Structures are given as C-alpha cells and as structure tokens.
C-alpha cells in the first residue's frame, strides 16, 4: 500500500504548491498596483491617468479646478484677449494650458485644438472636461452680420430694427387681436405655462434681450403665462417639467474632446452654454455630473450635454412638454447631424422637441420662434405653427437672409427640425372643443394689440 499512499501525497503536494504560487502572483499584482498607480497619477499633466471615472469629486479636486478656472477666466475676460485675433487667442490659450499642465492642473495630452468649432478642449486632472472658446459669446451676435473676417454683409436696414418693426404681426394674428376686444370670455384665461430660459448674455446693454422681453409680454396677453429666466442655472434646467412650453434661448456649440488611456479617441457632441459661473461650492454639488461628463466647463462657465437631460429626466418627468431650442448646432452640423439632444429630451418624456442643425442667424431664429409660438398659442398644433413660420420666414436662414438683401451668407444653412408629436398643442380644456377653439382663436391677442401695432 506504500506506493498508492506516496502517489496520493505527491499529488496533494503539487496542488498545494500551485495554490501557493497563484496566491503569490495575486499578492504581487496588488502590490504593484498600489505602488505604481499613485506614481502614474502624479505624472506631470499626464493625461493617461484617472480615465476610469471617479465616484466623487473631492474638495481638493474642486480647489484645483478653481485654480485652473481662475487662470482661464483671467485670460478670456481680459481686454487684451478681446482685442486679439483668433490666431492670437489660440496661441494664448495653448500657452496658458501648457502652464496649467506644467502645474499638474490639467492633463497635458488631453489638450486639443478644434479650429473648426472655435475652441480648445482639455481635461482637468480629476477627469472633468473643460475648454476655452476662441470666439467669445458676446461676439457671436456681431458675427451674425459682421462684414469682417467671416465675410458677411448686413441685410438692408437691419441695424435700424426694433422689436415692433422686426417682428410684425401677421394678418391672421392681427385679426385675432382685434376680435379679442369683443369676445373677452371666449377662451380660458390661461392656456398654458411657458418659460424662456434666456442665457445669451446677462441682459446688461444687450441687443437681444429687448426682443425676448417684448415676446414675453405679448404672450402673457395671449393667455400664455410666460416666465423669463435671465439667470439660468443647472438646477433650473432640472425643473423644466413645470411648464407646457420651454424655450432654450442660449448659445450652443460643438464640443470635441479626447479620451482613452492606451488608444486615444475623439468625440464631438452638441452642448448648451450657460452664463452660470463655476465656483468651488457648485463644483462639489455638481460633482457627479461633472465627472460623468454631463456638465462641461467652458471659460469657467457651465455647459450641458445631452446626457445631462437624459439623467435629469430619466423617470419621464417632462411629460407632454414642448421643448423649443434656439441654440446653434443643437442637432449638430450638416453631414454630421447629432440627434442626441432631441433623443434625450424625448426619452425624458417631452412630447415634441424642436432644434437647429448648424449655426443659425440671430434674427431668423427669433423670428421663427415668434411666429411659431404666436400660432401655437392661437390653438394650432406645433406642426402647423412651425409650417406657418417657415412659410413666413423661409425653410432655412439663408433663404431669409437673401430675401433681406444679404449678399454673402454663411456657408451652411441652418434649418429647424421637429422631433416627436407634430400634433402637440397647448392646453385645451376637455369641455372646449377644437371647433370652439378655432372660432375663438381670434380673441387671444387684444391685450397687446395697441403696443404691437
């Protein structure tokens, strides 16, 4: 029996040795990870670090970002930067980011120039995305009809326009306003609630804001209770479900960034720019969204991606809301249409979403908004209201531009696209039939007829 016993013992011994070797290998791997990972994270502006998302943003992370933001805003907010050419701004931005990478505040290999979309993108050391705009938001209005580098020529008499002259009443709207004086009780006092999320500028000395203030008052007179939000925050954009109609009046851009540890990839997506400035406290509060790239920081200001809306309304809270976006490149650009914004809002419960492909002319955009909402408030479906606006101002902004006498339009026409239910409309009481609404639609604008004439 000695032979079999010895064989069994040898077999047991060999298995035990293999088990010990495996344990030793695992232990060595853990030691190497513990020793080498922190060293990699500390590399000079590395960029190959922390590509796996952190679970939370620490106070230290936020403090480092604020240090970087202070340097970026000191550059972009300076008089010198305002006077620079685009090429000089690019050189200054790259020099500033090189210094921030040397200090370990941004990842050096994340710095990416996107001249087509006018920005330099980068990643903070903690993994949050950032960027520097080469064209300041305040300049975007001027670029619409600037005869300078972008080669545009202003349509005739555009400089003399006011809200009343630029946005006249169409005949059907005017007739409806006149009829209101004689049939005051034909429609419910309130036909819905709307919100204008105005984030083009801070309204001080603004060339845009008077038009939106005018529209707000006009729609109030139509029975559409309209809230004007001129200090739009990320928190505000999480509460759009309170309204029947939400208007996103803000600048938009196409943001390109690099990602990946061993193989670098690039991704481009639409973003909406806000005027809400980044602070240490807010960075911590918004930490999860920042790390998940649902929020991005440009020039020290917060911006949102499609994933922001997808996450904010993941339970479908936008039930039956109509979302109308004026932002440039909300749906991407020609030959690269990106429907992520519309898809995210529809997934969040929105009934209808409208937005632009390409950069859109300022005046065309607000004229389309004006006419669409006027007819939506008269009881028309959003599809019919949009069709009327296109019949009035043109299918795209280049058609409108040339009809105004413009001679050198921009390269790609901007056009408004509707997603979702084209039959969506504002609130109609159950006891108020469509026939009655059609008869009473003429009564809705009387309160503001005199001021709009």
Spell out what each predicted region is.
Residues 25-35:
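Bacterial N-terminal signal peptides
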Residues 80-213, 217-218, 256:
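Non-catalytic propeptide/linker segments at domain boundaries
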Residues 34-48:
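Sec-dependent signal peptide cleavage junction
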Residues 255-351:
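Cysteine protease catalytic core and zymogen-processing segment of caspase-like enzymes
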Residues 61, 67-77, 162-283, 287:
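A domain-level signal for caspase-like cysteine endopeptidase catalytic cores
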Residues 192, 222, 241-245, 317-323, ...:
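Loop/turn elements at helix/coil->beta-strand transitions in domains of secreted/extracellular proteins
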């Amino acid at each position: 029996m000695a032979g079999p016993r010895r064989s069994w013992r040898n077999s047991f011994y060999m298995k035990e040795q293999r088990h010990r070797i495996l344990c030793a290998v695992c232990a060595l791997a853990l030691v190497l990870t513990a020793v080498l990972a922190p060293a990699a994270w500390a590399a000079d502006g590395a960029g190959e670090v922390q590509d796996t998302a952190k679970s939370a943003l620490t106070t230290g992370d936020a403090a480092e970002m604020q240090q970087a933001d202070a340097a970026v805003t000191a550059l972009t907010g300076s008089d010198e930067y305002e006077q620079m050419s685009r090429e000089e701004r690019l050189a200054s931005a790259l020099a500033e980011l090189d210094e921030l990478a040397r200090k370990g505040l941004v990842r050096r290999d994340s710095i990416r120039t996107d001249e087509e979309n006018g920005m330099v993108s980068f990643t903070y050391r903690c993994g949050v995305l950032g960027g520097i705009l080469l064209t300041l938001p305040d300049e975007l209005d001027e670029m619409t009809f600037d005869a300078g580098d972008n080669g545009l020529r202003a349509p005739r008499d555009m400089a003399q326009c006011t809200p009343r002259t630029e946005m006249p009443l169409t005949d059907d709207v005017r007739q409806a306003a006149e009829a209101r004086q004689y049939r005051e009780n034909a429609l419910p006092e309130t036909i819905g609630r709307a919100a204008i999320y105005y984030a083009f500028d801070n309204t001080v000395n603004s060339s845009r804001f008077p038009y939106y203030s005018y529209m707000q008052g006009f729609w109030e007179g139509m029975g559409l209770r309209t809230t004007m939000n001129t200090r739009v925050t990320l928190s505000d954009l999480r509460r759009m479900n309170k309204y029947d109609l939400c208007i996103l009046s803000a600048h938009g851009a196409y943001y390109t960034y690099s990602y990946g540890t061993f193989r670098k990839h690039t991704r481009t997506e639409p973003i909406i720019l806000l005027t809400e400035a980044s602070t240490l406290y807010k960075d911590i509060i918004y930490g999860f969204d920042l790390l998940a790239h649902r929020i991005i920081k440009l020039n020290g200001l917060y911006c949102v991606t499609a994933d922001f809306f997808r996450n904010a309304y993941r339970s479908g809270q936008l039930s039956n809301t109509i979302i109308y976006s004026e932002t440039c490149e909300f749906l991407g650009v020609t030959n690269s249409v990106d429907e992520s914004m519309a898809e995210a809002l529809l997934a969040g419960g929105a009934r209808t979403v409208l937005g632009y492909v390409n950069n859109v002319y300022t005046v065309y955009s607000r004229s389309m908004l004006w006419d669409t909402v006027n007819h939506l408030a008269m009881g028309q479906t959003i599809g019919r209201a949009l069709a009327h606006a296109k019949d009035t101002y043109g299918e795209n902004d280049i058609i409108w531009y040339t009809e105004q006498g413009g001679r050198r339009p921009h390269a790609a026409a901007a056009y408004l696209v509707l997603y979702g239910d084209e039959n969506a409309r504002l609130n109609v009481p159950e006891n108020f039939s469509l026939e009655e609404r059609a008869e009473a639609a003429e009564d809705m604008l009387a309160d503001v007829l005199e001021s709009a004439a």
